[in-house]
């Protein structure tokens, strides 16, 4: 369900939104803002995924192998 909201944009963002509409990429301000919010939501989901992976990694024992050894092993594992 749509919700009417009022936003205040500075000159720079107002100009940018206008350029996006003039380019024909978007039909109106609402389309620009919806796309921007979808991109922001996707970025936040990626950031949260990375945070979750980091937290999961804190429970893994520390490896004393050098990075070169780890990379070499990874290359061998993926060689066909």
From Swiss-Prot:
Gene: parD
KW Plastid (keyword) present: no
A GO MF term: toxin sequestering activity
Highest taxon in the source lineage: Bacteria
Record keywords, A-Z: Plasmid, Toxin-antitoxin system
Listed InterPro entries: ParD, ParD_sf, Ribbon_hlx_hlx
Disulphide connectivity of cysteines: none
Protein name as it appears in the record: Antitoxin ParD
Pfam family, one: ParD_antitoxin
Swiss-Prot/TrEMBL GO biological process terms: detoxification; regulation of DNA-templated transcription
Protein family: Belongs to the ParD antitoxin family.
Function noted in UniProt: Antitoxin component of a type II toxin-antitoxin (TA) system. Neutralizes the effect of toxin ParE.
Keyword Lipid metabolism: no
